């Protein structure tokens, strides 16, 4: 594929989970931004098993006769990245843009992403300026970004921002990957030849709360560690070797001290011995837990169950007809 291949159609993929308050504004603003494009466009909204009225709102929007919206309804909640992959499976554009439904990243940035992608980039990432999140979220995001950069060698500054643009061949490459734990920005960068980042505005969340709770962030960190690299397993081997060497040295030292100071001294060191023993046992359990994480992910991948199940797609044929009329 030529690096400067023209973009004839843009697909916007937006995962939605319990966002009924923000959906009307999201649809209006995204549609208005897309109308500024010179290319044809489609807006794919993926309902990730919402329990509020999001499903009904998406269905109504996709059934609008003048709409460019496709609604993909999943049968339950599978997670943000699985929902985006479901959207990727439906896209027909040459450039695919992902966007969160909470409106913290403005849809009005869409034309900028398209313009930058036309310069020949495979992936256009974004960095949130003046980020409007809690200190906890900012700190957690900073730690995750540093970990990703060290593991991948890609020095992109904000992997947590989902407002990103991907060329179609990058999306097709990602669709050929069937692992269960998928972090799309990282996966895309493994296939991209040319990447760049632009700074975008970041607004406060107007409706509801973030879907990433503390436990979800911890699970995300485990996912990233185990799906990115096998470095933790290598570190375990090094730590295990160091502990074994330390244990051997400590044993020799205890024997020497017993010979020098007699059996009375050895009795006084029982608590020290137990403390060191518990430290070694604790390290072993940590290692076993990490190894179990890897084995569990291998087990999930070997079962080859689908990432998601699409219950219904609304508006696909209608969107194609609207594109033909505009041509």
Swiss-Prot record:
One of its GO terms (molecular function) is undecaprenyl-phosphate 4-deoxy-4-formamido-L-arabinose transferase activity. This is Undecaprenyl-phosphate 4-deoxy-4-formamido-L-arabinose transferase. Belongs to the glycosyltransferase 2 family. It comes from Yersinia pestis. The chain crosses the membrane at residues 235-255, 270-290. It comes from the Bacteria. Its EC number is 2.4.2.53. GO terms for cellular component: plasma membrane. It is found in: Cell inner membrane. The keyword Zinc does not apply. GO terms for biological process: 4-amino-4-deoxy-alpha-L-arabinopyranosyl undecaprenyl phosphate biosynthetic process; lipid A biosynthetic process; lipopolysaccharide biosynthetic process; response to antibiotic. The lineage of its organism: Bacteria, Pseudomonadati, Pseudomonadota, Gammaproteobacteria, Enterobacterales. It is a multi-pass membrane protein. Keywords: Antibiotic resistance, Cell inner membrane, Cell membrane, Glycosyltransferase, Lipid A biosynthesis, Lipid biosynthesis, Lipid metabolism, Lipopolysaccharide biosynthesis, Membrane, Transferase, Transmembrane, Transmembrane helix. It catalyses: UDP-4-deoxy-4-formamido-beta-L-arabinose + di-trans,octa-cis-undecaprenyl phosphate = 4-deoxy-4-formamido-alpha-L-arabinopyranosyl di-trans,octa-cis-undecaprenyl phosphate + UDP. InterPro entries: ArnC_tfrase, Glyco_trans_2-like, Glycosyltransferase_2, Nucleotide-diphossugar_trans. Pathway: Glycolipid biosynthesis; 4-amino-4-deoxy-alpha-L-arabinose undecaprenyl phosphate biosynthesis; 4-amino-4-deoxy-alpha-L-arabinose undecaprenyl phosphate from UDP-4-deoxy-4-formamido-beta-L-arabinose and undecaprenyl phosphate: step 1/2; Bacterial outer membrane biogenesis; lipopolysaccharide biosynthesis. PANTHER family: UNDECAPRENYL-PHOSPHATE 4-DEOXY-4-FORMAMIDO-L-ARABINOSE TRANSFERASE (PTHR48090:SF3), UNDECAPRENYL-PHOSPHATE 4-DEOXY-4-FORMAMIDO-L-ARABINOSE TRANSFERASE-RELATED (PTHR48090). Catalyzes the transfer of 4-deoxy-4-formamido-L-arabinose from UDP to undecaprenyl phosphate. The modified arabinose is attached to lipid A and is required for resistance to polymyxin and cationic antimicrobial peptides.
